[in-house]
Design a protein with these regions (language model features):
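N-terminal single-pass transmembrane signal-anchor helix
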Residues: 1-21
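Active-site micro-motifs of SAM-dependent methyltransferase domains
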Residues: 11, 23-26, 46, 103
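Short linear motifs centered on Gly/Pro in flexible linkers and helix caps
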Residues: 26, 32, 60, 106-108
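Membrane-proximal N-terminal amphipathic helix
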Residues: 26-52
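Extracellular/periplasmic head regions of type IV pilus-like filament subunits
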Residues: 45-105
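Short, surface-exposed interaction loops/tails
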Residues: 91-131
């Protein structure tokens, strides 16, 4: 009888540990996505300052090692669809780049980004032009 109680307690503790670990992993990946968005924003602002006040017109800048020496940031979790969604402006006056976070409601997509719309409860975290 005592052995069954001990086994049940161990099972409960293991279940709690696994759930806590999974939550920590999700938070860690979301933090990485937010940091990646800042890297992208900094690179685009550098592009702006070096190109007569124009932002990139398309995704070609993503492969430019001058702006992304370590390579363009990739989502920390392999996904069959892109987690990082760009929204370029053909007039080169603005940009918006968003990451789809795993934790809904933790984004800042109330920014006016046409690729995700105005969404205050979804999990998109966006950066946009600073100029």
């Amino acid at each position: 009888m005592e052995l069954l109680i001990v086994i049940a307690l161990i099972g409960i503790l293991v279940t709690m540990g696994v759930a806590s670990y999974s939550t920590a992993q999700v938070k860690s990946r979301d933090a990485r996505r937010k940091a990646d968005m800042k890297v992208i924003q900094n690179a685009f602002e550098q592009y702006y300052s070096e190109n007569d006040g124009d932002y990139p017109p398309d995704a070609s800048v993503e492969s430019d090692s001058a702006y992304f020496p370590g390579g363009f940031p990739k989502d920390p979790k392999p996904n069959p669809y892109p987690q990082y969604d760009p929204d370029y402006d053909s007039t080169q006056a603005l940009y918006c780049y968003c990451a789809d976070l795993e934790t809904d409601g933790s984004g800042n997509a109330d920014l006016d980004c046409t690729n995700v719309g105005s969404c205050t409860t979804c999990g998109y975290y966006c950066v946009r032009n600073l100029q």
